[in-house]
Amino acid sequence: MDKESKPQRLYVLQARNRNHPLTCREQIKNAFKDLREVPVGIDLREQSIIGVVSGGNREGAIDVLRLLAVQIAYNNCYTDVKLAAVYDEKKEVEASSLEPLKWFPHCWSTDKKTRYIAGSKDEAREVFFDLSQCLRDRFNSDKDNVSFSTHYVLMLTDKEYLEGELIKSYVDSKKNVGLHTIIVADSVTDLPNEV
């Protein structure tokens, strides 16, 4: 073992009554009840809206959003997942974290005419319009539980960007249209009711 590697922890569980299987099960459950510094998996197919609560640390929440985008792009082909990000370009933390996503091929429309990155409300309208065009046929389809070849992940640094926009009806819809929305909020009460 080299000097810099840390030894692994070994948990030894002592069963009071070795004949009773619930004793060991409860000890295992209690030993691993709280896990710290481990990756958390999110199945976007199961969740249409996800909230990232900053709890006063907005920079940390934006960083989580950026890391999610990078991991989604790294693990999925740009033809399978399209990423869209809407942020406030006037806020340095948001702009420095999310603006570089524009270089990902995942952030382009399939016809390569629209980049799904917006730093202002006007740019957001263009992104929302293009996404709405893509999702309209899916929404109007009579089929339920359809698996889509392309999924769209919409990342918002504020839920207010959705107000008055057509895409809000797709975000709020219970119908699966292949749209997954991740919203950053300062507290749980700032998230939409659907989260």
Would you name each region that the model predicts?
Residues 1-195:
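Accessory regions of macromolecular translocation/handling assemblies
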